[in-house]
Amino acid sequence: MKSETGYMGFVVVLVFMVLLALQLATLSAPATQIAYSDFRKLAAAAQLDDLEVSPTRITGVLRSASAAAALPASDAEAIKRAGTPWRFSTKRVTDERLIDTLAATGTRYRGADDDTWIGTLASWIVPIAVFALVWNLMLRRPRGGLQDWSGVGKSKPRVYVEAKTGIDFDDIAGIDEAKAELQQIVAFLRAPARYQRLGGKIPKGVLIVGAPGTGKTLLAKAVAGEAGVPFFSTSGSSFVEMFVGVGAARVRDLFEQAQQKAPCIIFIDELDALGKVRGAGLASGNDEREQTLNQLLVEMDGFQANSGVILMAATNRPEILDPALLRPGRFDRHIAIDRPDLTGRRQILSVHVKHVKLGPDVDLGELASRTPGFVGADLANIVNEAALHAAELDKPAIDMSDFDEAIDRAMTGMERKSRVMSEREKITIAHHEAGHALIAQTRAHSDPVKKVSIIPRGIAALGYTQQVPTEDRYVLRKSELLDRLDVLLGGRVAEEIVFGDVSTGAENDLERATEMARHMVARYGMSERIGLATFGDADTQGLSPLVWQRGGERCSESTATRIDDEIQRLLAEAHDRVSRTLKERRGALERIAGYLLEHEVVDHDKLVRLVNDEPTPEPGARDPGGDAAKRSGIGAAPAKPPAEVGSAELRDPARKADNADHSVPQ
């Protein structure tokens, strides 16, 4: 609607210019008056064309400049000066032979009516009237565009009246704690007298904080749907325009609309676009965004706690919000939505599969265990991708193989069937991934390996080793981190042992291993030589993984050198441990690599048999009922800090755009 209004001024000006040009075109090249006798000579000589014969006048053009030679010098000069076409005009006299002459010389002519003063006036009045009408319509349409000066300060939130949000708490799963906290808000909106009778004050504002895709907006709509009250939905970026004072005016207008429909809910999505901490810019004194934020603070102080208007907002960057916005009395209640655990993921999947047709072999528990770290939006996407995959194969229902493909695609990207690798590269990749898988199987604190593949996927992954945590963990021990270092270096060391050379494919492994070792030394106090002091970056990152928000090392140069030396020591010790293991288990390494070269994919059960040198059956149908997953003890979500080692990938060195771990979203 706003873009349509933005076109209006341009359209009006364009129409006016076109009409004006047409008028000027009719007035251009004025006709030169000549005598009728000269006209008769030119007609007899066949020097005329395009005649227009009216009851009182005859107009036309000369066929060439040389035809003007038959005219008096003054008329000839006037015609030439006017330029092409050489137009002339003469007063018509009674001449019965004129038509015969024109017919004999083959001159084109047509009849016309005389111009009247009414026609001339209409030719000017009509364009002006059209212009005025369009301009008036534009001004009277309150769309808030650049030409709509009267409505530029009006807020235009989406308003869902009563329970028409279409969402209630039954549509929300996996975040039971957040729903429980909001039950009080719903109860107040349904029966405010219950709280006012005892003098209680409902929170003025509720701030929902969570990573992208965790369901913040959905939760706010569910509150309105449960309470059955109007729901004003807008975003933080919609308040700020190019005009000074527009944002503040829209904030005032939004709260005025809400007061008229109380009890109701105002929901501002992406609050960080509006509520950033003030004074951070060079021109902060005249910053339009700061004026808008100031007005929001004033409005939140202005309406009463029991007025029935509740402000809800959502953000995934709470660390950059202004402290004045977060104090009690404004956003009194902060609700954090974390990534769902195993039970939460299963509940979320059960909601999303209600509208799809599932096969008898689909096990939501196994799917939940295979998607650690996934948020609600990720799980919804997996269900949709599985449905699309099944539809492409014309299946009557979605089975586990469709979900397997959807999960692999979400973790590592689309399978790159068009990428053709040489036999030498395949051998390198197979031994690299075999090294990761073998070390993961031999370490007591390593997560089980779900799948090993040398099929290229995504932008840069040439192969991957997919690990899935066995349980929800929020604290990691030093022994677990050391085992993870070993797994990350398994691919690189395997190349050294088998080929006596190394490749560029371990780039991502080395980056992650170095980062993990740095955290152990500088943040977690896991180095005896450095001690218990921490020298890590200030924790300003919050939920937004932006590198520019991180500070530098808070230590002296000598301490930084010692930290670097300790990181090198940890990596060197991990390298030695991995090297000893792979040399001792060289046979298992070759068996895994050989199986990968033949079949391209190894699942958990086959990997265990290959490591233990047991007979390996040919690849066939997957174990019914998720037996493989049950035997492997595959469980739930990754630990929080540090980032989960979900997979080790061999990456294409020519594609450095994506160095993130595709296997387990963080």
From Swiss-Prot:
The record's Pfam families line, in alphabetical order, gives: AAA, AAA_lid_3, Peptidase_M41
Q: Which PROSITE patterns match?
A: AAA
Which pairs are disulfide-linked?
Answer: none
List every stretch annotated Disordered.
Answer: 612-666
Cofactor stoichiometry and binding remark: Binds 1 zinc ion per subunit.
Q: Which residues lie on this side of the membrane: Periplasmic?
A: 28-116
Where in or outside the cell is it found?
Cell inner membrane
Q: Name one GO biological process term.
A: proteolysis
Cytoplasmic topology: which positions? 1-6, 138-666
Spell out the molecular function terms from Gene Ontology. Answer: ATP binding; ATP hydrolysis activity; ATP-dependent peptidase activity; metalloendopeptidase activity; zinc ion binding
Stretches that traverse the bilayer = 7-27, 117-137
Q: What cellular-component terms does GO give this entry?
A: plasma membrane
Q: Where does ATP bind?
A: 210-217
According to the UniProt entry, which residue ranges have a biased composition of type Basic and acidic residues? 620-630, 649-666
Q: What is its main location?
A: membrane
Which superkingdom does the taxonomy of this entry point to?
Bacteria
Say yes or no: keyword Nucleotide-binding present.
Answer: yes
Active-site residues (renumbered): 433
Summarize the protein's role.
Answer: Acts as a processive, ATP-dependent zinc metallopeptidase for both cytoplasmic and membrane proteins. Plays a role in the quality control of integral membrane proteins.
Q: How does it assemble?
A: Homohexamer.
UniProt protein name = ATP-dependent zinc metalloprotease FtsH
Which species expresses this protein natively? Burkholderia pseudomallei (strain 1710b)
Its organism's taxonomic lineage begins at: Bacteria, Pseudomonadati, Pseudomonadota, Betaproteobacteria, Burkholderiales
